[in-house]
């Protein structure tokens, strides 16, 4: 069902909301907003002006219409048939990043540890959070420099690399639910694991920020570690071509890239989608790949690895929208 919004006012339960101050883009190519640089269009894409504007937009969307929150689109594929509902772009909007001065309402710091809390909104790029922490003499967040997405996405999937995960240092979550209610939640309210985070009591809501507790330490050493991690990433990953990072989760006790390479799939290509010759757990767009090319290649890798090794790889990337 199609719903048209008037920019002058938004009808919500209880009356008329303030004027929406953001921008609607109609039939917006999502290839402009995902790191694969491929895929279909969003029927409606909204760029909110700020958090308050986002809240009112969510309250205005009919209950039967899907909402998709997107940051940098670094682990997202939108099928060529496009995506219905409303896509909301958070990167460049929810950008607050600051040392937290308040103590009320936050879990107490562990005894005998000198720590500080950083608040980062969902639209902040993960590498920016890593650099901010290091600049303020805080350690433990360096690995975030290796995550090519936003804080919101990192929290949602418990992103990690180099032996650390996003939820290792989270002490409180800032969320927005489908009713447009802002909440502050504790990590104990979630089930988390490898590339997974979900409320114990399922409820449709999105992460709009998080509070990270980090230890005070040697900021210069932290900045050097970030530089070292980035050098490793540049040397081992195909960053010169459009990609979405790791396509598959590592199975227990093994590596997805090793299994894919062992099956002779490095360099395998469907259309302009190719299994990277540099890192087998990356699929790159070597020209004008379509979302269909990429999805077919993902499925081919899954089927081939399972046939050869009896291991079914689990996807780390998210695919939304309609097939063409």
UniProtKB/Swiss-Prot annotation:
This is UDP-N-acetylenolpyruvoylglucosamine reductase. Pfam families: FAD_binding_4 (PF01565), MurB_C (PF02873). The keyword Cell membrane does not apply. Residues 38-231 form the FAD-binding PCMH-type domain. Pathway: Cell wall biogenesis; peptidoglycan biosynthesis. Its cofactor is FAD. GO terms for molecular function: FAD binding; UDP-N-acetylmuramate dehydrogenase activity. Belongs to the MurB family. Transmembrane segments: none annotated. Cell wall formation. It is found in: Cytoplasm. GO terms for cellular component: cytosol. Gene3D superfamilies: 3.30.465.10, UDP-N-acetylenolpyruvoylglucosamine reductase, C-terminal domain, Uridine Diphospho-n-acetylenolpyruvylglucosamine Reductase, domain 2. GO terms for biological process: cell division; cell wall organization; peptidoglycan biosynthetic process; regulation of cell shape.
């Amino acid at each position: 069902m199609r719903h048209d919004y008037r920019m002058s006012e938004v009808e919500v339960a209880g009356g008329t909301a303030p004027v929406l101050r953001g921008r609607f883009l109609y039939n917006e190519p999502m290839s402009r907003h995902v790191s694969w640089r491929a895929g279909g269009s969003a029927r409606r894409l909204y760029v909110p002006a700020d958090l308050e504007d986002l809240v009112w937009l969510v309250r205005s969307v009919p209950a039967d219409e899907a909402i998709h929150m997107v940051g940098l689109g670094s682990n997202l594929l939108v099928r060529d048939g496009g995506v219905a509902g409303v896509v909301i772009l958070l990167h460049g909007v929810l950008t607050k990043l600051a040392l937290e001065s308040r103590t009320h309402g936050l879990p107490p710091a562990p005894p005998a540890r000198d720590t500080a809390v950083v608040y980062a909104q969902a639209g902040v790029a993960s590498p920016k959070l890593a650099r901010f922490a290091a600049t303020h003499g805080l350690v433990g967040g360096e690995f975030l420099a290796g995550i090519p997405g936003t804080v919101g996405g990192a929290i949602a999937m418990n992103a990690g690399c180099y032996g650390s995960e996003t939820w290792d240092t989270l002490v409180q979550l800032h969320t927005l639910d489908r009713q447009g209610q802002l909440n502050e939640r504790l990590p104990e309210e979630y089930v988390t694991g490898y590339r997974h985070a979900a409320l114990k009591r399922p409820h449709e809501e999105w992460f709009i920020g998080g509070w990270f507790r980090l230890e005070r330490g040697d900021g210069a050493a932290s900045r050097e570690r970030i530089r070292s991690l980035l050098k490793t990433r540049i040397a081992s990953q195909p960053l010169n071509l459009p990609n979405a990072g790791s396509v598959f989760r590592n199975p227990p006790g093994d590596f997805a890239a090793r299994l894919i390479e062992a099956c002779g799939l490095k360099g395998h290509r469907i259309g302009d989608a190719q299994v990277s010759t540099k890192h087998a757990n990356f699929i790159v767009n070597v020209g004008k790949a379509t979302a269909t090319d990429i999805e077919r290649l993902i499925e081919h890798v899954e089927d081939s690895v399972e046939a050869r090794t009896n291991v079914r790889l689990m996807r780390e990337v998210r695919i939304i929208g309609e097939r063409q």
